[in-house]
UniProtKB/Swiss-Prot annotation:
It holds the Pfam family Usp. This is Universal stress protein C. Belongs to the universal stress protein A family. The lineage of its organism: Bacteria, Pseudomonadati, Pseudomonadota, Gammaproteobacteria, Enterobacterales. Required for resistance to DNA-damaging agents. CDD domains: USP-A-like. It comes from Escherichia coli O6:H1 (strain CFT073 / ATCC 700928 / UPEC). The keyword Cytoplasm applies. The gene is uspC.
Length: 142
C-alpha cells in the first residue's frame, strides 16, 4: 500500500528529524504530500503572568515553534505542503486535521521525553479513533 498524503506529528526536539525522514522515505517514491503538526506551549499555564505578558509570550512561543518547523522543512530535502501549530490536546487536533485535509497516514513518535510521552499517549488515542493508518516510529536520542 502506498500513502500519498502524510501528516507527521513533531515536537520542537531533534528527534523530529527522524519522523520527517521516515515520512520522506514513504512519500518520495510516490511523489506524496507531507504536512506537519505540532503543539506549541500554551503560556496560560504560567497563570501568574499579567494578561498583556501572556499575549506577548504566546506570540514568542508561536514564532519559535514556526522557526523550528521552518528549519525542519529546510533540512528535509523534500517539500512540506502545510504546517499546523496546535494548542491543547494533540490527538484531537490530529483527528480533526485528518478529517479536514484527507490524510491517509499519520506518523507519530514513541519516546520517553515529556512531549513524546504525551505524543505516545496521544498516538494511542489517535490509533483507537483514527479512520486512517497510524505509524508509530521508535525514536532514538542523539
Amino acid at each position: 500500500m502506498s500513502y500519498s498524503n502524510i501528516l507527521v506529528a513533531v515536537a520542537v526536539t531533534p528527534e523530529s528529524q527522524q519522523l520527517l525522514a521516515k515520512a520522506v522515505s514513504i512519500a518520495r517514491p510516490v511523489k506524496g504530500h507531507i504536512s506537519l503538526i505540532t503543539l506549541a506551549s500554551d503560556p496560560e499555564m504560567y497563570n501568574q503572568l499579567a494578561a498583556p505578558m501572556l499575549e506577548d509570550l504566546r506570540n514568542v512561543m508561536q514564532e519559535e515553534t514556526q522557526s523550528f518547523l521552518d528549519k525542519l522543512i529546510q533540512d528535509a530535502g523534500y517539500p512540506v505542503d502545510k504546517t499546523f501549530i496546535a494548542y491543547g490536546e494533540l490527538s484531537e487536533h490530529i483527528l480533526e486535521v485528518c478529517r479536514k485535509h484527507h490524510f491517509d497516514l499519520v506518523i507519530c513518535g514513541n519516546h520517553n521525553h515529556s512531549f513524546f510521552s504525551r505524543a505516545s499517549c496521544s498516538a494511542k488515542r489517535v490509533i483507537t479513533s483514527s479512520e486512517v493508518d497510524v505509524l508509530l516510529v521508535p525514536l532514538t536520542g542523539d
